[in-house]
From Swiss-Prot:
Residues modified to N6-succinyllysine: 4, 35
Pathway: Energy metabolism; oxidative phosphorylation
Modified residues annotated as Phosphoserine in this record: 31, 33
Membrane topology: Single-pass membrane protein
Signal peptide, first to last residue: none
Record-given protein name: Cytochrome c oxidase subunit 4 isoform 1, mitochondrial
GO biological process: mitochondrial electron transport, cytochrome c to oxygen
Main localization (coarse): mitochondrion
Localization of this protein: Mitochondrion inner membrane
Subunit architecture: Component of the cytochrome c oxidase (complex IV, CIV), a multisubunit enzyme composed of 14 subunits. The complex is composed of a catalytic core of 3 subunits MT-CO1, MT-CO2 and MT-CO3, encoded in the mitochondrial DNA, and 11 supernumerary subunits COX4I, COX5A, COX5B, COX6A, COX6B, COX6C, COX7A, COX7B, COX7C, COX8 and NDUFA4, which are encoded in the nuclear genome.
Species the sequence originates in: Sapajus apella (Brown-capped capuchin)
Function: Component of the cytochrome c oxidase, the last enzyme in the mitochondrial electron transport chain which drives oxidative phosphorylation. The respiratory chain contains 3 multisubunit complexes succinate dehydrogenase (complex II, CII), ubiquinol-cytochrome c oxidoreductase (cytochrome b-c1 complex, complex III, CIII) and cytochrome c oxidase (complex IV, CIV), that cooperate to transfer electrons derived from NADH and succinate to molecular oxygen, creating an electrochemical gradient over the inner membrane that drives transmembrane transport and the ATP synthase.
C-alpha cells in the first residue's frame, strides 16, 4: 500500500461557513495573465481597473 503525504507548502482549502475562504483554492502555478496582474499590483492599486481589483 502507498501512503500519500500531504503537501503543507500551501494552506489547506476547506469550504466552511464560519471561516470563509475564496471560491478558488490556492494555486501553485500562475497563468501568464495572473503573473501580469501580480506585477501590476506591485504599483499603485489606484491604477487597477475594477475588474482587476476583483480578480
Amino acid at each position: 500500500s502507498v501512503v500519500k503525504s500531504e503537501d503543507y507548502a500551501l494552506p489547506s482549502y476547506v469550504d466552511r461557513r464560519d471561516y470563509p475562504l475564496p471560491d478558488v483554492a490556492h494555486v501553485r502555478h500562475l497563468s501568464a495573465s495572473q503573473k501580469a496582474l501580480k506585477e501590476k499590483e506591485k504599483a499603485s492599486w489606484s491604477s487597477l481597473s475594477m475588474d482587476e481589483k476583483v480578480e
